């Protein structure tokens, strides 16, 4: 079993939340959170370089600060090549290539509601609304944020709407 240190983030128009975690290559092993999460005001940053410098400084106290990967769930439409996104209602540009250079690891960008939809099958507690049997059909994920976030999930494939 191999364990890697990863950086995950939820970057919205108001706040950016970062967490370092240990992730096993065994899918049965639950990721372990490392250190305290970091919450920063997105509006305090005009450049991702200063944002990620603060993130790296926060997690530098951990024993293993070399991230093996990073995943950023960002409020906004990700470009078709998956390498950039502008955070909605801000001027903050997130670029996976630049972020990867700053953090010395590969960075993956996804839409924040894409990430939410992908998490649905792993939810521990869910409550059905409405009657009838639960069918293995397309599921919708809706939620408030900087706007109304939406995604659909079918057969474990998520699509932001």
Segments predicted by a language model, with ranges:
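N-terminal Rossmann-like NAD(P) cofactor-binding subdomain of oxidoreductases
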Residues: 113, 117
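Short coil/turn connectors at secondary-structure junctions
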Residues: 3-4, 104-105, 135-139
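Glycine/GP-enriched mid-protein hinge/lid loop-to-helix segment characteristic of carbohydrate kinases
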Residues: 131, 135-161
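Short acidic-glycine loop/turn motifs at beta-strand connectors
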Residues: 22-25, 81, 153-157
């Amino acid at each position: 079993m191999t364990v890697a240190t990863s950086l995950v983030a939820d970057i919205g128009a108001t706040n950016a939340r970062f967490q370092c975690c240990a992730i096993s290559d065994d899918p049965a092993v639950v990721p372990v959170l490392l250190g305290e999460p970091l919450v920063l005001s997105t509006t305090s940053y005009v450049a991702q370089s200063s944002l990620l410098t603060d993130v790296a400084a926060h997690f530098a106290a951990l024993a293993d600060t070399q991230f093996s990967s990073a995943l950023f769930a960002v409020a906004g439409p990700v470009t078709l090549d998956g390498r950039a996104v502008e955070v909605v209602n801000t001027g903050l540009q997130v670029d996976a290539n630049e972020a990867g250079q700053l953090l010395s690891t590969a960075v993956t960008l996804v839409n924040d509601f894409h990430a939410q939809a992908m998490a649905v099958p792993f939810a521990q507690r869910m409550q059905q609304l409405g009657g009838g049997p639960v069918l293995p059909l397309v599921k919708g994920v809706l939620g408030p944020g900087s706007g109304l976030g939406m995604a659909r999930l079918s057969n474990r494939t998520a699509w932001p709407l």
